[in-house]
Amino acid sequence: MNEEIDYQAMLHVALEEARSGLAEGGIPIGAALFNKNGTLLGRGHNRRVQENDPSVHGETDAFRKAGRQRRYQDTIMVTTLAPCWYCSGLIVQFRIGKVVVGESRTFRGGIDWL
């Protein structure tokens, strides 16, 4: 992976999504999926409350909005909070190459599995 990538800028996209979720009355967790060069593929936020759907987490929302990719090994998932086991499973299943986590002290989720 390219070490010239601005991970802070990527995290800023995820933070914008978290703020959107909070403004909608939902859980403020955001995520974004980028290609290996830092190009945004998809962004999303937790919509469990808004859609009354327990499966719409920030990571799954960003993943879905990115659309089908040829391969995921060269992608980067950026999330404001450590992925839960469900989202960690998605990351492992599709072999997403790198995960950038904004915060993992209050919730560790499946981070040790990644």
Mark where each language-model region is.
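Residue-level signal for beta-strand positions within conserved beta-sheet cores that form or flank
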Residues: E4, I27, Q73
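Short beta-strand scaffold segments in enzyme catalytic cores
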Residues: I29-G38
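A short, flexible N-terminal coil/short beta segment enriched in small residues
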Residues: A14, G21, N37-G44
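Alpha-helical structural signal
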Residues: Y7, L11, I29-G30, E59, ...
